[in-house]
Amino acid sequence: DGKLDYDRLTGFTAEGEAELAAQMGPVGAEGSVAVPDLVADTATYLGYLKGEGLNVSGVVDLAKYYTIETETVDVDKLLSDVFFLIVPEENVEGRTYLTRTSSGGFDLNRDNSFQTQAETQNMTQLIAAWNPVSFTEFHGRVKQFQCEPCDPPHEPNFEYDLLAEHLMAGGEALGIAAVANNDGYNSYVIPQRDYLSYTGAKAADGADQTCWYDPWDDMSTSYTPQYAMLHGTVAYTVEVPAYNDDVAAAVAYGQLGQSAYIAENKQEYLLAQTKIFERGVTNANSDAYELVGQWFCDQYDVEGAEAELFRPEYDGAGQNGNFYPECYIIPLDGANQSNLQAAADMMEWLSRNDVKILVSETAFSYSGVRYPAGTMVVSLYQAKRSVANGALYDGTVITGWPVLYSEGITAFAKTRGFDMVTCAEPAAYRTIRAACGDWMDHADCVRYLANVTSSFTGVEGAKVILSNASEDSTAAVNALLQAGKGVGMILSGEQAGSFLCDYSDWRSVCTQYRLSGAGVAEADAPLSLTITKAPVVYISGKPSDSRTGFVKTSLVSGSYQYNYDRQAMELLGFQVTDDASLATLVIGAAALDEAGLAAVENGAAYIGYGSNAISAITGYTDRRGNQIPGCLLSTGSLVRETVSSESMDALAYVTYPTQSLITASYVSEGDELLYGYGAGYFSAIPEGAQVLIRLDGAREPLEGFLVGGGEHYDDFLDNSIQAISYQKDGLNLALFANTLTNKLHQRDEFNFISNMAFSSLLGGVY
């Protein structure tokens, strides 16, 4: 008859209230569950109670503890109130082959901000186009049956106070219906509701102190629901407890209950999302405590305690006093933009994510620089300002929390390596806006980018200095070398680390890639050495085929580091081999394997980065307590430390104390920033090693998660060694304490790998 019935928990019985108090524990007692002030008025705790003796979701005597009503949903009316976008499976190949990862070897639920994979590009574009008021994604497995909203810390680009109007109630609507309509899993948890604990101590004001000991946070927008929240969407990840018929019923009824709640409150949902967009269009300041500010609590749940950390305001002379600037200026001309490829890619990324783009039609000046017509301007006066700012802002350095679920890095200008200027002065923005044309959507930007091509200045018909600044520049050099063309690497001067080629060869690649070139007469060409041949790269850590089931399961499932490296090499245009004996360069974030080790010992150059690669060299203790010896270097000569076991990453200023072609292009470009996942450094290096990179202890990092109480926190920040080179006993090594290819996002670090590849083929060490 077009109607669906489901049971809904509506309240607690007397026994239920007593059991709730017992399971939450005495107020103020160490380990008891505390009710967060910010959700005390919206959280009902219906569905919280676990079965006797259980700490996971299981069977509960619902009738004993809850009052229950049967709700009837008229499906036709529901569909007249709301419509549904249903994506049965984002990861089609993963579903086919029973792997969490995609065929590319990526966890797609860590790629929604970076959007390096086709699957996430498609999903995020769908969200951006439809602007759903609510989004729910089902995952597994968390045996407690977990439904969001997340606990803090929260991503600062969320307009969280408006999202919070329905986050808790919508999450509970799903959880309540799910657990009340299946036979096996009758309780669920919500991080924001259930994960705050009493410490047993008193706060300074005499109140019982509380603490988020193990946050399930939404600081990272790499997860699909958290990405959706940037679009004003009330969004959830649901972590089911198992894969079986009971859970299938729970998911179906959970969605029904949540859908009924959304239909009942659809005008309020639409109004809240409209207010989010209104804040964007007016670039309103929503930092106040009573708005977003209160949601930036510290680890001890003091509301607003970290508002200034998470939402610092532009408070200089003439600036807007807002967390959001007025606009970002991204040049698209060769004089002002060192990385044309990444800048053009950013225009496509932003517009694909429903950020509207402006392009100047006349020249304008800002902060003493004249920008020509054709300069990209990303205005924050638009509905999707949170999406734009979430991608382009520098980020937050978090030190006061014990753990995060994933790194929060975006900072595209820094991690992808293009030049960008931030404007926070309203008066200057008005001048910039007046120079621009109409707003451009994705289709407009794609058409426009067809005419954003390589930049060339100077003498034609002689030599060309090809700037070493991007994946495209590396791929172009590889294309020339693989075609048998001569390419030199510049050894010194302002262009050290860039390339020298013939003008005719430049012409053969400048239309295929977005490059920057400067023509010079042969007599004026800078000193260079010819790269003797095209590099051949061996990537350490490729697993053998699986013996049963899908033969590539071992490759695509769990071999994250290998797949990051593999896709990075594809972007850079390197020839990759599975026969290490043919390699001129061995690379890897994974541990150096047997074949790679043999190649390095026989003369191939090696660049290793991150904890696994370095541990294979230094030696380590395995899970069983066995001491595994290192390789290449003598025991104890290289020591890698980390800030703490839970620390993750840093985008930090660095110095380059040693002249080397491995770092030369960064020095020439004035690139003083290094991103690395791992929060590591070298506390001891082998005799004869050269320090390539140190952290700049005089400057604060821009972004990162570094536990302030970590054993080596101060050591890490105190000019710590981040990278070394070592040429001795026939070895040619470059070793980095942290990652260079993590999740394919940190592309500004790719050139360390390519510089090693090319410089090792110059006939000496440079």
Predicted regions span which residues?
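Intrinsic-disorder/low-complexity accessory segments
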Residues: 1-83, 157-219, 224-766
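Aromatic/His-enriched, Gly/Pro-containing loop or helix-boundary segments
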Residues: 21, 49, 108-121
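Extended hydrophobic secondary-structure segments that form protein cores and membrane-embedded regions
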Residues: 83-89
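Divalent metal-coordination and catalytic microenvironments
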Residues: 86, 108, 123, 136, ...
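Active-site neighborhood of divalent metal-dependent phosphoester/pyrophosphate hydrolases
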Residues: 91-93
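Short, solvent-exposed loop/turn and secondary-structure capping segments
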Residues: 96-102, 120, 139, 145-151, ...
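Acidic/histidine-rich helix-loop elements
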Residues: 105
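Active-site-proximal loop/hinge segments that shape catalytic or ion-binding/gating pockets
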Residues: 115-120, 124-185
